[in-house]
Amino acid sequence: MKVLVLNCGSSSIKYKLFEMTTKEVLAQGGIEKIGLPGSFLKLTLPNGEKKILEKDVPEHTTGVQFIFDTLTNAEYGAVNNLHEIKAVGHRVLHGGTKFSGSVLIDDAVIAAVEECCDLGPLHNPANLKGIYAVQKLLPEVPQVAVFDTAFHQTMPDYAYLYPIPYQYFEKYGIRRYGFHGTSHRYVSKRVCEYLGIPQEGSKIITCHIGNGGSIAAVKDGKCIDTTMGLTPLEGLMMGTRCGDIDGGAITYIMKKEGLTPDEMSTLLNKKSGVLGMFEKSSDMRELEDAVARGEERAILTENMYFYRITKYIGAYTAAMDGVDVILFTGGVGENQATARSGVCKTLGYLGVKIDPEKNKVRGKEAIISTDDSKVKVVVIPTDEELMIATDTMDILNSMNK
């Protein structure tokens, strides 16, 4: 069974086509600059070779059609015809409180996702464009929505509510939702398989660290807390997002600088974090190089970045009354040994010991703690697309029973 996974952004569409009987990736790629000059599709051929196809892509329906044309292309396609695609799974950012799991898309689901656009104004409208496009181009093919927020719906109320007047939760749904849920769900399940331990009784801290970053406390296979909040802005210091900040500092800067709410949002989301402190780049690899050169601002930025992660690991250990596994994933978590060792260097009180040799691993599943470490520290590369495809297939199978 072939399942197509789409991740639609405001000016991009990423795709992966899976053969679900073997979990093999048959095709993958993405369109950039939708609605802008110079739009193109970049695909990876089965032999690893990259190919770029330039074409004017004014909107998402044209983009999805471009992907379909590419998938069926005689030279570099992956299917003979589109009838081979049995379902399409979509990454949808925000499901609010409406969705605690993945769902078959129908008119009611679309209406509910539209209602959540206020909560995910940058992502949900783009996710919907992908859904509308497939409805138009492949109307008979079932579609499934997999929500970034769903995994965190098991958080208790005392963890997800903000201590502001309760009426704002009742009126506007102001609460912590959390994100990267599909990634946290995948890696927390996968690490139990990898270590040969049951999810029941496990206490796992999953650190998804990339340009965006979040941590989740996963107890018995369920999320009990996570660092991101109403939006992906809360929590860790990230590439361009500030993470936790005193609300008073926000209103103070707005008054001093005469900033509108939208301008302040841009400052906190696009101009802060590593970029705001380091001022040269938001890329952790460039920061690492600057630290190696002894640049003081780079060293300060890195210390802040690691400290936030370490602090949350300590907090979530307390929240779960212990920890068995600390897991690193995401672009930085999977590939940057200095980040992992930097985060773990003050976790000795938990009995964490990192093996410097094992920690050299990049992008592969590995235990990087020593044999006598009281807590297992593990790298598990995330695979959100496979998780989306698996959910899609499971829902399709349940329909056919």
Segments (PLM) and residue ranges:
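N-terminal glycine/serine-rich phosphate-binding loop of ATP-dependent small-molecule kinases
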Residues: 1-96
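Internal helix-turn-beta structural module
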Residues: 299, 303-324, 333-401
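Phosphate/pyrophosphate-binding loops at sites that engage ATP/ADP/AMP, CoA/4′-phosphopantetheine
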Residues: 70-85, 191-198, 313-324
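Glycine-rich beta-strand-to-loop/alpha-helix junction loops that act as flexible
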Residues: 9, 90-93, 209, 323, ...
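Catalytic phosphate/nucleotide-handling subdomain of diverse soluble enzymes
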Residues: 219, 225-257, 266, 330-361
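Adenine-nucleotide phosphate-binding core of ATP-dependent small-molecule kinases
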Residues: 266, 273-277, 284-319
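Short beta-strand-loop/turn "lid" adjacent to the catalytic site in phosphate-handling enzymes
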Residues: 71-123, 144, 150-159
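Glycine-rich phosphate-binding loop of actin/hexokinase-like ATP-binding domains
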Residues: 151-255
